[in-house]
Amino acid sequence: GIFSNMYXRTPAGYFRGPXGYXXN
């Protein structure tokens, strides 16, 4: 989603946030 575009997606399909990984 929005955060995926901001932080880039990981192979797992989650987004990388400033505090780590979170579900998308």
Swiss-Prot record:
Cysteine disulfide links: none
Keyword Disulfide bond on entry: no
One cellular component (GO) term of this entry: extracellular region
Family the entry assigns: Belongs to the DEFL family. Group IV subfamily.
Tissue specificity note: Distributed in the epidermal cell layer of leaves and in the subepidermal layer region of stems. Not in roots.
Keywords of this entry: Antibiotic, Antimicrobial, Cell wall, Fungicide, Plant defense, Secreted
Location, primary (coarse class): secreted
Cell compartment(s), UniProt: Secreted, Cell wall
Main function: Antimicrobial peptide. Active against Fusarium spp., Gram-positive and Gram-negative bacterial pathogens.
Organism of provenance: Spinacia oleracea
Protein name, as recorded: Defensin D6
Any one Gene Ontology BP term: killing of cells of another organism
